[in-house]
Swiss-Prot record:
Signal peptide residue numbers: 1-23
Ranges annotated as spanning the membrane: 81-101
Disulphide-bridged cysteine pairs: none
Biological classification of the source: Viruses, Riboviria, Orthornavirae, Pisuviricota, Pisoniviricetes
Designated name of the protein: Non-structural protein 7a
Entry similarity comment: Belongs to the coronaviruses ns7/ns7a protein family.
Localization: Host membrane
Record key words, sorted: Host membrane, Membrane, Signal, Transmembrane, Transmembrane helix
Function: May function in the formation of membrane-bound replication complexes or in the assembly of the virus.
Main location: host cell
Annotated InterPro entries: Corona_7 (IPR003449)
Domain of life, per lineage: Viruses
Length: 101
C-alpha cells in the first residue's frame, strides 16, 4: 500500500511539472513572437527617434536559434514526463487491481 501511495504522489508531481512546462512553452512562444515583431519593425524605415527607441528593446546578442532550441528541449522534456506519467499510471492501476483481487 505504501508503494501505491508513493506512486500516486510521484504521479501528481509529474502532472504539476507538465503543467509548469506548458506554461514555460507558452512564455517562450510569446517571447519569440515579440522578438520577431520587434525585429520586423526595426527592418522598416521610420523616423530616427522611433528606431532608436525600438533598438533599445532589441539586444545585440539576439539569437533565435537559442530560443528555438530551448523551446524544443521544453517540448522533449514534456514528452518524456508524459511517458513516465503513463508508466506510473499503469503501475498504479496494476497495484490497485492486485490489491483488490
Amino acid at each position: 500500500m505504501l508503494v501505491f501511495l508513493h506512486a500516486v504522489f510521484i504521479t501528481v508531481l509529474i502532472l504539476l511539472l507538465i503543467g509548469r512546462l506548458q506554461l514555460l512553452e507558452r512564455l517562450l512562444l510569446n517571447h519569440s513572437l515579440n522578438l520577431k515583431t520587434v525585429n520586423n519593425v526595426l527592418g522598416v524605415t521610420h523616423t530616427g527617434l522611433k528606431v532608436n527607441c525600438l533598438q533599445l528593446l532589441k539586444p545585440d546578442c539576439l539569437d533565435f536559434n537559442i530560443l528555438h532550441r530551448s523551446l524544443a528541449e521544453t517540448r522533449l522534456l514534456k514528452v518524456v514526463l508524459r511517458v513516465i506519467f503513463l508508466v506510473l499510471l499503469g503501475f498504479c492501476c496494476y497495484r490497485l487491481l492486485v490489491t483488490l483481487f
